[in-house]
């Protein structure tokens, strides 16, 4: 039995896969197995998998003839894994030098349920850069599980990526911590369940993983009904089920509820786009899971969603909620129809706000965003600019600008509000849209 199983779902990554696999083969630690799950690739990825499996006895390949999304591929990999610990690697990323030694040393020192890892970011040209969070090493060394869960929940928007964690395989199997199949935001479901079930944690203090954001071509690069809205609702429901079944209390309940609120907020940003057939499917999902929706009453904002479906039923309630989201968004610019409207920043929330306003007949000039990488990009037909462009506008034209700050994070709202004020934007020149 190897110490470590590396499970890698593979789908159309012929330009990245060899670097990923070579970063494993170059490790100085060798007590591992690699399980490649070729998820019905249509490029040369399957052949690359076969070549490595033929040359190296600790690399295995499983070919799927129907794509089952990353969740299905990971579950198949987990079923075939033999290692004491499991790591799920993305096939377009790779490992840092000596990272397996960091992992093995951590395992042999403490044998935790879950190991939390750090990463470095190497984006492709034109892709966005992401910074790692600053973990408090002392909290992990004190081994107070509740304190660790609370600490991780403080970074909840940043840590919901499967590759951050190495988990004890028997712990995963015993607690039935698998991936929600048929949906695309499986990380958002798996990570909270993992964190809220684990009793022991350890932290690898050195970055062990290299995350490579891609400019385009990833499975989640396009926001659609199938890969976002439907998945967000299903994932939120799955977490509510987990909350009820495990009877989570204290910080664990608070953490799960915060992720549900986040997911329902994302769901709200696209509900204006739903067509009739999608509304019917979503209503059926809601109808089948109404028993879990009582929890939503405890969360502000998502309570509105619950109120509509509880009072009017899943189908009419969802339709009324969609109308409510549109009207609440339009309300933010009421009386400023004649001004140049900008949305600040980009992202699910900002892009949803811009789309709703455009579809309701408002002229949106563009986005403001603090990302240098996004500066000059075109998103949904709108140009992205740094907020500093406001410095170059004379007072008369500046007074004719109206900005909607659109995000889910209240602490970010205050930062952006103060930034706009420093650029001579007055209080009556911006509104805040939180989903």
Model-derived features with residue positions:
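Phosphate-bearing ligand-interacting subdomains
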Residues: 372-435
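Glycine-rich, basic loop-to-helix element that forms the pyrophosphate-binding segment
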Residues: 64-81, 88
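Cell-envelope/extracellular polymer assembly enzymes that use nucleotide-activated donors
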Residues: 2-5, 23, 33, 189
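Short, well-formed alpha-helical segments that are part of the catalytic scaffolds
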Residues: 12-26
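Donor-binding/catalytic cores of nucleotide-activated saccharide
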Residues: 67, 71-73, 91-205, 209-227
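Membrane-interface aromatic/basic loop that binds lipid-linked glycans or pyrophosphate carriers
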Residues: 273-342, 352-360
